[in-house]
Regions:
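The feature captures the beta-strand-to-loop junction immediately N-terminal to the Walker
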Residues: 40-42
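Conserved ABC ATPase signature
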Residues: 142-146, 150
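Conserved ABC ATPase "signature" region
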Residues: 71, 120-137
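Helix-to-loop junction immediately C-terminal to a conserved catalytic motif
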Residues: 55
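Conserved ABC transporter NBD signature motif
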Residues: 63-71
């Protein structure tokens, strides 16, 4: 399902005299359907960078990243978008959304983007928002007005509303309360 072959990532810091920082070197990883894999490491060790490369947000400096046989390092943007729609979900540490979009539509968007009927998509979004204790009175508001914990629960709902074959979770519970 997901294969990384000799993946490296370097960042060029233009505001630091073009310093080059090597974040990941020669990473190899094979994840089969049904497997659950955890990346463990210290802050700044490249875990989020690796997930962003797998999701196609960052381009690898070298190597190949295959998701269901599609190499994201050479794929066209439309191919990457199709992988994101149908194959690969992503719950990041922070929710990033358009401020004018109500929470209910933010959660339903992955379903709407693949053509699922709006009524069914919104019903599924409602179920998840209820399960994650987001008060109904907030559903028509933008999640940008929510607390950090509420935003993260919206982010989790959005990631789980569609059954992606693979789901990347980047510290999805970091801003949640113990309960």
């Amino acid at each position: 399902m997901i294969q990384l072959r000799s993946v490296s990532k370097k960042f060029k810091l233009f505001n630091q005299q073009n310093a080059i920082i090597s974040v990941i070197e020669n990473a190899n990883l094979n994840i089969s359907p049904g497997e659950c894999v955890a990346l463990v490491g210290a802050s700044g060790s490249g875990k989020s960078t690796l997930m962003r490369m797998i999701y196609g947000n960052y381009l690898a400096t070298s190597g190949s990243i295959l998701v269901d046989g599609i190499d994201l390092t050479t794929a066209e943007p439309r191919e990457i978008l199709e992988v994101r729609k149908r194959k690969l979900g992503y719950v990041s540490q922070f929710l990033r959304v358009v401020p004018r979009v109500p929470t209910l539509k933010v959660v339903a968007e992955p379903l709407l983007s693949i053509g699922k009927p709006e009524t069914e998509s919104l019903e599924m979004a409602e179920e998840l928002l209820e399960e994650l204790n987001i008060p109904k009175k907030l559903w028509q508001l933008s999640p940008t007005t929510f607390s950090g914990g509420e935003q993260q629960r919206v982010n989790i709902a959005r990631g789980f509303v569609y059954e992606f074959p693979a789901l990347l979770l980047d510290e999805p519970t970091a801003s949640l309360d113990k309960e």
